[in-house]
Curated annotation (Swiss-Prot):
GO molecular function, one term: cobalt ion binding
Pathway noted in the entry: Amino-acid biosynthesis; L-lysine biosynthesis via DAP pathway; LL-2,6-diaminopimelate from (S)-tetrahydrodipicolinate (succinylase route): step 3/3
Binding-site positions, Zn(2+) 2: D99, E134, H348
Protein name: Succinyl-diaminopimelate desuccinylase
Encoding gene, per UniProt annotation: dapE
Lineage, opening ranks: Bacteria, Pseudomonadati, Pseudomonadota, Gammaproteobacteria, Lysobacterales
Organism: Xanthomonas euvesicatoria pv. vesicatoria (strain 85-10) (Xanthomonas campestris pv. vesicatoria)
Length: 376
């Protein structure tokens, strides 16, 4: 069994459902220390974070990943135990195989190989891991970034091991992500009998024109390689369950995925103004998950495009699609950020898996990226 495959299996066997780490980072730190890395454990709240560095000074290249996984769901739905890694027909199955214990294992192996071959490399190679990526992401990289700001820690380049490939390893290079902003709108009315609407105020009827305007609005036409900003209603609830009662309150949850054309305060102001025009009696709670980030043409992007093209046999698609990642907390530090990882077809699903051949190729891919950035 190859080194990366063995380490991936060891990590999968640790049931690190967010925010638990289940000893993953301790095992990784032991290996990185043996390779000459300095390791710092940053426990913030209930979350484990690991900051490991080799070398000194600029440029600083960070390999960013997470050791937590989403819950497996009903175990009887899996072909095999989600935390008992199994290889069948050249495919490794287990929770976290693709998202993202395979990438984390590949980071470790690539880092070990790189510093063994280039012990006096230029700049700093760092590995940053958290156990709070799949959950609320409050005490993970978000908090670590605050610590870095206080210390004056700079980062030049960041490679996140998120499963970015679509069909074959290296066919997509993630160069940015949209921002994410969620809102919970509560519209107040007056409860009453449906036969006497004049004695009540139906919050569904009152809010309907405003909601229609919200969902019909075209926020922008996209930005660079970003798709247009999108607002989606995700949950609507009102009423007691009885069909003869006008509800006294309506609650609507919604989410915006937005381009760098916007920021969260401007979007919040726009939506508040729209609701005010409709003279609603309402409250609105916001949750800012992260601002958008975008890595323009530069050394990191050009090197990654070149390396992925070599490994995949064709230039990668360069995309800003998908959800959010922890790179959104590193980019504001001034870092150029990209995401490179295995095929994402099975992430968060029953029988999550990664092709063994892809997993075994990942360390060489990451090591090549590191060498072209830190070896002059």
């Amino acid at each position: 069994m190859s080194d990366v495959l063995e380490l991936t299996c060891d990590l999968i066997a640790r049931a690190s459902v967010t925010p638990a780490d289940a000893g993953c980072q301790a095992a990784i730190a032991q290996r990185l220390r043996a390779a000459g890395f300095g390791c710092e454990h940053l426990r913030l709240g209930e979350v484990e974070n690991l900051w490991a560095t080799h070398g000194s000074g600029a440029p600083v290249l960070v390999l960013l990943g997470h050791t937590d996984v989403v819950p497996p769901g009903p175990r009887e739905a899996w072909t095999s135990d989600p935390f008992d890694p199994q290889i069948r027909d050249g495919v490794l199955y287990g929770r976290g195989a693709a998202d993202m214990k395979g990438s984390v294992a590949a980071f470790v192996v690539a880092a070990e190989q790189f510093v063994a071959a280039h012990p006096t490399h230029s700049g700093t190679l760092a590995v940053l891991l958290t156990s709070d990526e799949e959950g609320d992401a409050i005490d993970g990289v978000r908090r670590v970034a605050e610590v870095f700001r206080e210390r004056g820690q700079t980062i030049d380049w960041c490679i996140t091991g998120e499963p970015s490939s679509t069909e074959r390893l290296g066919d997509l290079l993630r160069v940015g992500r949209r921002g994410s902003l969620s809102g919970t709108l509560t519209v107040k009315g007056v409860q009453g009998h449906v036969a006497y609407p004049h004695k009540a105020r139906n919050p569904i009827h009152l809010a309907a024109p405003a909601l229609a305007e919200l969902v019909a609005r075209q926020w922008d036409d996209g930005f660079e390689s970003f798709p247009p900003t999108s607002l989606q209603l995700s949950n609507i609830h009102a009423g007691t369950g009885a069909n003869n009662v006008i509800p006294g309150e309506l609650q609507v949850a919604f989410n915006l995925r937005y381009t760098p054309h916007w920021d969260a305060p401007r979007l919040e102001a726009e939506i508040t103004a729209l609701l005010d025009r409709h003279a609603l009696d309402y409250t609105l709670r916001w949750h800012r998950s992260g601002e958008p980030f975008y890595t323009p043409e530069g050394r990191l992007r050009s090197v990654a495009r070149e390396v992925l093209g070599e490994f995949a046999g064709a230039p990668p698609e360069e995309s800003t699609g998908g959800g959010t990642s922890d790179a959104r907390f590193i980019a504001p530090l001034g870092a150029q950020c990209i995401e490179v990882g295995p095929v994402n077809a099975s992430i968060h699903q029953v029988d999550e898996h990664v092709r063994v051949a892809d997993l075994q190729a990942l360390p060489a891919l990451y090591r090549t990226l590191i060498e072209r950035l830190l070896v002059e």
